[in-house]
């Protein structure tokens, strides 16, 4: 499953990922994002990226929906599923 997405609690093919028209990010553009690079299957500076994501979300009064530890685990699971040792992980919270 090379190109994958994690949407609403599930991993699946990127081509099948959809966002509800009722999503606030879709309707009003509210959202934050982070891009995390991986090297040899390891996310680079993951704690710093997740801390910045959390700060950015708090500034917009958005919940990131998971703890940093949970996001770290999800990111590592996504890497395992994708089978890409070198990747860019794009996290978008709306």
Region roles according to the model:
Residues 1-94:
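Conserved alpha/beta cores of soluble small-molecule-handling proteins
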